[in-house]
Structures are given as C-alpha cells and as structure tokens.
C-alpha cells in the first residue's frame, strides 16, 4: 500500500472515533510571501517571456476571483496555463501548469545575482532551490542566501510555440491596418464570389470595418485588401491565411500613397533578415562588409521580388538599401526600431513564440552581423548597449539548451557562449568564415564555469562503495578527493565508468540527474536587501511547485501551504511534506479541491493520533458571512493576535461570531520576534504586552461566552491555552512545552537576538506547540455538541432528536448542516457541511428540511490535506463533502426523508447588506443564464441579496461592501455571461426621530375599514442589540422576547403587545377586544412588513420604527376586508405616522482602522476627514500609529486606491460595519431626491397629508 493509500486509510479510521476528532478554525489575518517583483519575466510554455505584473493582469481575466482584500488578490484559472517548470526528482525542465495567480503588497525585497550576470528580485521569505554539497537540492530563503551558494537555474526552456502555418497567419494579423495584401487574380475572384454569396452589405456589417461599404467592395473587387480586414474576412469566409502567404504581395500604406508591392520571404529567411537588421541595420539600410552575407541578402531580396544593390564607398563598410516596405514589415512583426536602434531593440512575442527553426535563424542573423568567435576566451560573443535585449537573447538561447553569461563594460554589455556542450548546441552562423572559426573552436573547447556540478567528492566515494579506485579511470581520485571540481562532462564520465563496473542504485540515478543539461548550478555573487513599496506576484504551479523566471527556478506557494503556513499556524517546511495530507497524484474521481479551505491533518499527541479538520476563516469584513458559516462547522478556534498590533478589530468581530456559535477559543500570540528585535522590549515590557493581549481576549470571552463557560474558556499561560511565537520563522512556545523541553524564555530571547530563529524552529516547531494546544484544550465533537446543540438547533434538546444530536450519535437520525456550496464542473454542486448526528452514505435518499424536498446523495467524502477523498459513508462529528444534492443552499439541514429532524435555524449574520449594484446582461440571450447564475450565487453566499426583475432584465445585487460586490460581478463573468455593472449604490435606512402620539388614520380604498396607529422610535439599545446579534427576535418565543425587550429597556406594556418584528422594526397590537382583528392580523403584518421594506421618504428599508395599532374599524364582510383593502390602509397609516414622527434618512457607517508609519499620520487623517469622516482614536506604538476613524459607506468607494497613494503603499487598513447615523441635514434633501429619481419616483418626497387624508381627498 502506497503512502497515499495509507494516509487515506488512517483518515477513514480516525473519522469513526469522534473522541479523536477536532474541528477547528483559525481566526487570523493571512500573510503571504514567496513572490517576485513586477519586472520578473516568466517563461511560458507557449514561448513567451512575460513580465509578472503583465501576466497577472492577462490571466486574471481568465480566472475566478477567490480572495481579495487590501493586501492580497488571488484568481483561480479556468484553464491552467503552461510554464517551464523543474521536476526536482529527475532534474528535468518540464511543462508545469499555472492554476492560480497572486498579487500582494510588499515592503521589502531581496535582489540576488548569480555568476552568469542575471539577477532577480523576490520577497525575503521566497525560497530558492540550492544545490547542497551533499548532492541534494534544498530550499533556502532569499534573505538567508550567502555568496558562494549554488542556485539551480534554467539552461533549457519548454517551447510549444507557433507552427509554421500559425506563424504565417500571425504575420497577416500583425501587418494589420498599415498594409495592403495584393491577392493573385484567381484568389481575388474566388474571395469576391464567396463575399457575394454572403452578401457584400451583410458581410460589411458583420465585420464592422471602419471603411465605407463602397470602399470595402472596391478592395474586394481589386483584390487589394487591408491586412486587418483580410484577417477578419478569412475567419468569416473560412479562408486559410497560411495558404495565401506564399501567393500574395504586400505594400505599406503611407500617408500619401502605397509602396510598391513585394512578396513575403520564406519564414526562415524572414527571421534571418530580421536578425541581420537587429545587428547591422539602420532603418532601411544594412551595413555589412561580408560578401557572403551580401549574397544571402540579395538572394532573399530577389525572392521578395526586389533587386537590391550593394553600395561600396572608399574607406567605409558596404551598404545595402531596402525600399520602405521592408523595414515597415520588420517594424510590424519584430518591433524593429526606427531610431536609436541599438538602445531600443527588444525581443518581442512574435519572436519568442516562433517555431524553433525560425528563432535559430534570427540568432544566426544577429550573430552573423554582430557576433565574434573569440579564440582566446574559447567563446562566441556579441556586444550591445541594450542589456534587456541581451538578457532576452540569453533566454532565447535556453530554448536550444545553450548556457551563456553576461558581462558589463565600457557602457555596453557582452553575452558569451562557451563550453563544449553549449557551443555544440549553439545555432551557429550562415557566414562561412565565422562558421569555420566556430568549428575549430569546438574541436578544442572544454567545459565552462557554467557546467560546474559543485558537489562534494565524498558523494562519489559513497556511490563507488566497495569498487576499488584502480578500476576507475586515470585521475579519478582527484574528483573524489576534491582537488578537481566536477563538471557535467566529467560527472558523465564518472557515471559511465561506475555503470561499467556494475554500480547501480538510487544514488547513481541522482548523479545522472545532476549531469543533465536542463539546469545549471550558478554561484551567488551578490545578495542585497532593498526597500520596496508596491506589488509582488506569485503563480501557483500545483504539481512541481516552481516555475522558470529570468533564468531562475522560482519556488512558488502551494495553496495548501498557504492556507496553513500563511495563516501563521503551521511551519512551511512541514506543511507540504509531512503534516498536511497532501499528495501530488490526482485522483480522477475526486470532485474538487475546495478553495473554502477545508484542510485535514493527522497529529500525534502523547502517543495517540488525532484527525484535525481545519476550516479557514476569511479576515475581511466583506466576507463576514463566510466567517459565520465556517464557525457553524467548528467546535474550537485558534485566535491569532499580533504581538505588536494587538487584537485587530476584525479579529474581535470574528471572535464575537465564534463565541455566539459556542466555539471555544485558544490564543496564539504571533510575531513575538518583532518585540525582541525591532521594538527591543525588555522581558518585563514583553510580559506586560502579553498580559494586555490576554486580558483583552479574556474580556471578550467574559462578555460574550455562554454563562456556564465564561471562566472555563478564559485563556491562560499556566494551563497552556496560550502559546507564543513567530509563524514567519516557524517557532512556537507554551508553558507546558517549556516544562517538557526545558527551554526558557531567556533562551527564546537569545535565539532571536542571535539570529538563530531557524534553529529555534527545530527545537520548538510551531505546529507541534499549536496542535498540542488544540488537542488538549479544544473539544471533540461529542463534548462540544452536548452544549452547542441547544444554541444552534431550535428544537427541544431533551427530545429524542435532541438527545441524538447532543450525543453526536452516528446511529441516530441524520442531521447534516450545509455550510458551503461550491460548483465544480466535473462533480456539479459540492455541499460541505458538519454531520451532527447519524451517518451520510453514498446513494442515500435524503430530505432537505428547509426546502422541503427529497434528493439522493451521489458521492460522499472527507478531506485529506486539501483534497476530497471518497468514502462509503461519513459518520457524525466529521466535516463531509457531498455531491448530488440538487438545489441545496448554504444553511440547509440534510436529514432522513421518513422522519425528518427539525431543521437547524437559518444561519444568522450580523451585517445586513449595505451596498447594491444593478447587474444587466450585455446580450439579451444571456438573460436566462444570468438569472440562473444569480440564484446560484445567492446559494453559495447567503449574505448576498438578489432581486431579479425578469421583465426589465436589470437585477439588484446587494452585498457587504465594494469588494464583495466586485467579487460577485467577477464570479458572474467567469461563468460566461458578459455583464454591465452599475456604480455601487448605498442602501440607506429610514428612521423616526420623534413621536407621533396622535392616532393616524389609514382608510381602505373602499372606505369600509379604518386603522389607527401611533409611531415612535424603538429604543436604540434594542436596535443595536439586534444588529450586533445579541438576540434574534425571530428565534424567540413570545415570553422570551418579552423578557429580553424589558431587559433592554422597553416598557412592559409595549413588550407584551409586540405582534411581529421585521429586522429592527416592531409592530404592536394595543387594541382591546376588537371584532374581526384576528382575521385581518396576517394582512396587517404583511402591510407592516411591506412598509418597513420601503419607507415613505425614498422607499429605503426602515430601521428602529415602532408602530402601535391602537384602534380599528373592520367591516364584518370578509369580501370587504381582503388584502387589496387592508394592506394599503395600514401602509398609509404607517407612512403618515412616520412622516409626523420626524422621519429622516440614515446612512450606513464604517469604522476604518489604519496602521501606518507616524510620518504618514497626517495623510491618513486628511483622507478620512475628506470623506466626511471623523477620527475617533489614535494609538502610538513605536514609530507606528493606529488610527481609528469612522466614515459613511457612501464616501468609502475608491478608498483602497486613495489611501495607498496617500501613504505610498505603507498603510495596512481594515474596515468594519459601524451601524447607522442620520444623514447630515444639508445633504439629506439632495440624497433623497437622487434616490427617488433613480427609482423612477417623483423627486419630491411625500408629505403627511399625502397619506392621512382620504384617497382622492
């Protein structure tokens, strides 16, 4: 049984032992490293070298946004993109697949230069692949590299460029609108006939060309068609441009008249000519004294239908002049510069994507022009003032497995190709004299510096084993003794000799891998830390975890490492290799790798193994809905707090949600190394800092934990529920661990001060400390459900079902709560959820309790690492992944159809959506698909509210903030519907600020029914308590609600009279003994709810409105008191009463927390205050300040970009919902008018008399 199967079996075994399961979340801000600077060129499999920033922008349009906050943006690609990548085991360059692209903020970079003259800038924590003297390829952080280390660099690149046919088509595309293509008579007639069959006018309209119909027809008739029009025409009529390439002529369209038509040369000749012109050209002139080259040029020109003359001048080099069309073609295809050619030449995509034969001809042309064969250096060289061109030429040579090095001198740069192996593969020369010199050079060429394999001779001795040295070749002992360094050639000789004497085995295979020419091992000559302010980029290559960039092998971040190590909990070295159950092989039957971060691991504690299911929790306020759903699935949470910054506001928000769901916390204080090395705090000061953080967390637990757990759940150093450390460096410490190992806090300080944190990570690995804490202090499902069920399940905990749930009984009735629904193109809807009781099985018929429909389970699975593995069944206490549940929603209860359990309550979220966008399909035929997608998105994310208007085609989507809505829009686009999205619209509230004691009458349209109401504000303490989730009236019995309302300050009589609650609005029945009232009460409630959804001022939702029904006259005949009579009557009374009670507009507010260097404090406060914001608090920590501000949501659009500019990228900021405040008086009228006009209402808001008087009165 392989490793993967063993681990899968271990997972399956542990999932049946609930006492050994821990379902946990991490409450933290995720930091990400391992990135490259924007200018870094990534070597794609299609042949291109693309800057990291440009590649990110290109690929994000082909992906799905999976994460976005102030510091990080991540996209999952719909189709992976090929890139050159290193298979570390075989030491071969292969094609890897980019699956995700990342953009992050960085404030520091490390620049690394190696011996071939190339350099790269990465983040300090980025890991390079380094050849260890032991022969192993190991990982080493950028900021730990030393001069003399040998980095693994590429010598070979994957090239899957254009075929010759594709190249010919691309030529026409690039010639574009600046060239006419002249078709031979026969082809011209054929094209014209095809066009006539389609209809000239219809074709002209379809192509949407920028010329008149007559001109279009004229071009077709004459067979002289603009190249860009021909490209579109060929696609529309089914013509193959590649077939036309050899038959047509082209002319350049100048401002005055077109140039003389010429034929296109054969592709290889075209590239050779381009290489010559890049070397010796000056726009339309080629200056070169070689008669052989002159002869080649004349031949190529003749093939193009040109006759060129060689101009010879005394004392000067001979020159050939070309007509204007030739340099114009080179400009269109190769970006050949008109002026300052030497400085401006570059290698473009047309060249990098060309067939290898063509690229080889370009290199030959360039070296024929400017190259030199240097006998003294045993090298071929070429010199240019353009460093960028030579660096790209270096990468072009790697397509032929040719190593080269770059040197600077006297204002120019020289590229050298040396060493027998590279010279042999070098494309060579057409020029006979240089070709002959190269031939002679190769006869005596030896190995170059770039062919070194810097491993210890001791490795050879170990591989040789018992074979005596006398059986090896002469001078072999010099290699084994280390007197002579190994090269690839000498290593090959060693390997073949060892094989000849019968040596075999894994060690020998490893030597063979190191002798391959796919990579070279280059010495580090410079490591320099540089300050930086801006974005960095990463590209996830899932199988090989690296990609080729700038000639380096760049190690990248895997998603599973990121979820764990990035969240600051698991050491990076162990996350991928030992701890996480992550495997390179892909199971064909697996449905999806869940990006909601359900990751599992097995951890050993005191000799027992435990299955730990980690559910990642987003940190951004825009995703608070995701946090709540994650908290529903877990029993415990690791709260990560930065030692420097303290408890961040969003950490507090998430912890509050966790405690409300009865999730038990433990505390990890992160970045302790910064207190020691940066802030240089004394042990006493550090202790005070820790006590402050622990006290703050315990204060929240005291305030928000269930009464019976307020003391038990408090965290403390003594019992080990608090740990300290640095996730960045991978170490952690706790009191029990210190007692067990003898490590003291004094040792910790010394390790940090002496820059030995890596050694500390070996002594005290963070994963060991944190996961020990998890197993010891956080509950298993059986323990947790005993006290959680009464909070999260509305049924009677003492009933049979309640007891089954509390016991987490796998043999009881099925109850699974769906917390997340994702769409997978292979598996369909994948529902992830917590199984609270019973067992869910493949093929089982189940009942969706909230939707009241039956469906059948197709597959079930659990998580192993980040992957889903199939099992026959998943028992209670586990996180299950289920396919086949059609139309399932996040929050749904999955149960048995014969005897369904009472559904769990709908998941509650604190924040109501505050921002809305209008979404419209650009193409009307996409409307049904858009509606389907919007329904699906509402399923996946219950915090999204969608209003669909199938008549107008415009749909309103409301979310938690600007970022949230951007992500929703992107999800729609990536599912194939092109949409128009309006500017974000703020969702205001309407509230009353006075009391209307007068009984306001509302008459029904038939005048047979009258309702009398009073209106006043709900007590603000009650409104805030509901908004903060302290209680939910919809979950409570009438008696419970009555007591709670009185507790928060409502009058007893009012509390007893509450008939219904809509959000934070209350409808009270204060009538006594009214006949027929019970029969119309449902309609009165419906009218009240409609009025609260759309208030009188601007049809915005209401907040904190208390409506009391005090009297009524109701017609005895039911016919006269139906919905059409009662609902308008009560709404008119409510609206009239609200207007008399001084109704005003309320706007949503956000807290803004900005951490920034002190120098930028003024810029931040100015930015906040310029948005109608106020500064609430400023705290100082060293030279950093934390500014707390408050501003209206309406003013916060574009804040991310503006704050970044104002602070030059130095600000870290978060926002949090801050309730509602009255709109300033001077703005209110204008805002109401704008809202009403937007909704198609008359601009002026209504007056009380518009509702209080009789209809038509």
Swiss-Prot record:
Cellular compartments annotated: Cytoplasm
GO molecular function list: endonuclease activity; GTP binding; GTPase activity; translation elongation factor activity
UniProt keywords, alphabetically: Autocatalytic cleavage, Cytoplasm, Elongation factor, Endonuclease, GTP-binding, Hydrolase, Intron homing, Nuclease, Nucleotide-binding, Protein biosynthesis, Protein splicing
HAMAP family per the UniProt record, alphabetical: EF_G_EF_2_A
Feature: compositional bias, Basic and acidic residues: 1237-1250
Additional information: The intein interrupts the GTP-binding site.
Species per Swiss-Prot/TrEMBL record: Methanopyrus kandleri (strain AV19 / DSM 6324 / JCM 9639 / NBRC 100938)
Binding site for GTP: 616-620, 670-673
Name this protein carries in UniProt: Elongation factor 2
Entry's family note: Belongs to the TRAFAC class translation factor GTPase superfamily. Classic translation factor GTPase family. EF-G/EF-2 subfamily.
Residue numbers spanned by region Disordered: 1237-1257
